[in-house]
């Protein structure tokens, strides 16, 4: 096993993840831990209703990389043409200020929880440019199955 992708990791106490990671490290110290965190607004909503929701900064204590859901809402607004790219870049700058220096975010245009990018960004050049941009951002790039073929359905 190379690693674990932990679904909605923000809603599980970080102390559990730290214990799980230590137990796995005793067997495989090179195991990679990927946290699917939650959109910032969803984490805030959960907290307002008394539901535990760890911040991305807290989750990084136990994980090697996280989905970029903390800035995903702004990125989606950019993809829909609602805000300029500079707004998303400002959000990325915020990540630089609030996470550990070695933080690693999983950058993506689509995944199993998101609509296919080609279903709403119809300009092929824009798809190519947005995909290329991911490779120049700090973090790890995810190309979801079929994205390279401009699939517009699940």
Question: For each predicted feature, which ranges?
Answer:
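Short, acidic/polar
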Residues: 1, 125-131
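Short secondary-structure junctions and interdomain/linker hinges
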Residues: 95, 99-102, 115-116, 138-141
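Loop/turn elements at helix/coil->beta-strand transitions in domains of secreted/extracellular proteins
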Residues: 1-3, 28-32, 138-142
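Active-site-proximal helices and loops of the catalytic beta/alpha 8
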Residues: 7-100, 105, 122-124, 133, ...
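Substrate-binding cleft of secreted/luminal carbohydrate-active enzymes
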Residues: 131-152
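Short catalytic-loop micro-motif centered on adjacent basic/acidic residues
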Residues: 3-9, 117-118
